[in-house]
Amino acid sequence: MKAKLFNFQGSDYLTFTLEGMFFPVTLPVITKGNRSKANAWTWNGCLEKPTLRPSIRTKYSNLEGEETEIHYWLNDGVCDCLSDCKDGNANRKIPLKEI
């Protein structure tokens, strides 16, 4: 399994970790209804090969303690990094770790 779904205070969250990263990403996801007025990502319902929309932009500290940023689409369990990534992963494909 590449992702885990859990509920916290009535909202559903999906958590996953990219290969090479030391921290999980946890995002609110829509499991019922549509994205209209929802502050959450749409999700394809698959824990093995999750797809989320819209894109994901995450700021984090690298191993040197410098703030950096990754920006990607999550498609079928693979992180498709966009060209504006500032962490050296621009235009790369990164799989998700097993949970």
Language model feature labels by segment:
Residues 1-15, 23-99:
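A short Gly-Trp-Pro
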